Amino acid sequence: MAGLAIFPNLRAHIDHRQRSMGRRSRVADQHKVLVLNGPNLNMLGVREPEIYGSDTLADIESTCQKHAATLGLSIEFRQSNIEGELVTWIQEARETTDALIVNAGAFTHTSVALLDALSIYQKPIIELHMSNIFAREEFRHRSYISAAASGIICGFGANGYALALDAVNRLLARG
């Protein structure tokens, strides 16, 4: 502390920094959730509306943004038809997010690569399916990614995204 005599304003600066670090902004306090959407989900509203409904992915994203705001969550919404891109986003999310919501689409039933990426994430993961995969074709009954998920939501259509946000919020609140 003898050095403080040389820099008389240093103590005030250190005290101010410590106090300001203790007061984080509301945005900084928000948990960040990455919502990943796999192949063909960019075609929602057009593809099999009798199964998936008439909402587009943009409609769902808008609803999710509003719902996340009511929960105090910050979300980023992404979609890719490319398996490797989803894997990269999951790997990057380890450092930048607090939870994942994953609607892997058809990759659910085929991708060991997604399972491996999700297995190293080590934070809450909600697996999401708009349709009830167990009421559909036999090949859809198997999910490779379920083994890495904290929980699974399926069969609630576009409302499943809000349910997934609620689940993530509860998991994050538990710590």
Regions found by a protein language model. Give the residues of each.
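Extreme N-terminal starter segment of soluble prokaryotic enzymes
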Residues: 29-33
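Short glycine-rich anion-binding loops that position phosphate/pyrophosphate groups of nucleotides
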Residues: 39-41, 105-108, 131-133
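Glycine- and acidic-residue-enriched helix-capping/strand-helix junction motifs
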Residues: 44-58
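Short beta->alpha junction loops
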Residues: 74-84
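Short acidic/histidine-rich motifs immediately flanking catalytic phosphotransfer sites
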Residues: 93-100
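Short Gly/Thr/Asp-enriched flexible loops that form oxyanion-binding sites at enzyme active sites
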Residues: 111-121
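Short, acidic/small-residue loops that bind anionic groups at enzyme active sites
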Residues: 119-136
